[in-house]
């Protein structure tokens, strides 16, 4: 389980592999940093956009992880379990294209998680002189980490909500997002987003009070309390 402050806030996990960081407005764009492969399909697409002013090459690295988080354990995926195509993309400035991910793993009731790193590489090596006399790249390599969740092939979406104790529990075998907005007129920025994996439980005082509280599962909003008029927030 992990929490994100602000319902509409997106925190990009960017790593500039050089001594000079590029402006974030000109970095790779891949949309939501957590994406899922539904239980009824065996592939999912991820769009990559080149927001730079010159061409870039895009490559992917995949690690299997036990559970997303700061203490996650990364391992090499079983051969053939998760494939992707194409091997790399070459995009001109402003262009976009899709990577496709194909799952050929076990058809069971267990959810699986993968860390997918998108690597953006300049097609040319431009440098400038640093104050110390050395040279640094003016077009760095940028790596953006995302999480791919392969939902169980035998999926069970279940949850429980206890308003008396202010508790939401994931009693199924697949993840969902919980949106908590205190009060009926609070803004998106005042809300919190919680990502609940199987068996995760959230205890929050706000859940005992009136507010717009939703679950988001497969891009669908599920209102869990009737204390406010229905007004679905953004799922970002």
UniProtKB/Swiss-Prot annotation:
Keywords: Chaperone, Fimbrium biogenesis, Signal. Residues 1-27 form the signal peptide. Disulfide bonds: none annotated. Induction: Negatively regulated by H-NS. Positively regulated by IHF and EcpR. InterPro entries: Ig-like_fold, PapD-like_sf. Belongs to the EcpB/EcpE family. Part of the ecpRABCDE operon, which encodes the E.coli common pilus (ECP). ECP is found in both commensal and pathogenic strains and plays a dual role in early-stage biofilm development and host cell recognition. This is Probable fimbrial chaperone EcpE.
């Amino acid at each position: 389980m992990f929490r994100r402050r602000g319902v509409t806030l997106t925190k990009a996990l960017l790593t500039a592999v050089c001594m000079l960081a590029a402006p974030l407005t000109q970095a790779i764009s891949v949309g939501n940093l957590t994406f899922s492969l539904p239980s009824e399909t065996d592939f999912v697409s991820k769009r990559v956009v080149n927001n730079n002013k010159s061409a870039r090459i895009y490559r992917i690295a995949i690690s299997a992880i036990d559970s997303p988080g700061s203490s996650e354990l990364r391992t090499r995926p079983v051969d053939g379990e998760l494939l992707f195509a194409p091997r790399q993309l070459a995009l001109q400035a402003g262009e976009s294209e899709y990577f496709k991910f194909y799952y050929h793993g076990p058809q069971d009731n267990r959810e699986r998680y993968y860390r997918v790193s998108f690597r953006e590489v300049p097609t040319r090596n431009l440098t400038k002189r640093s104050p110390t006399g050395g040279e640094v790249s003016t077009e760095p390599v940028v790596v953006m980490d995302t999480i791919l969740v392969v939902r169980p092939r035998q999926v069970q979406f279940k949850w429980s909500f206890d308003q008396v104790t202010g508790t939401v529990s994931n009693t199924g075998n697949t993840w969902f997002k919980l949106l908590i907005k205190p009060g009926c007129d609070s803004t998106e920025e005042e809300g919190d987003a919680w990502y609940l994996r199987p068996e995760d439980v959230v205890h929050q005082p706000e859940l005992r009070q009136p507010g717009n509280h939703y679950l988001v599962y497969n891009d669908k909003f599920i209102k869990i309390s009737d204390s406010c008029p229905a007004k679905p927030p953004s799922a970002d």
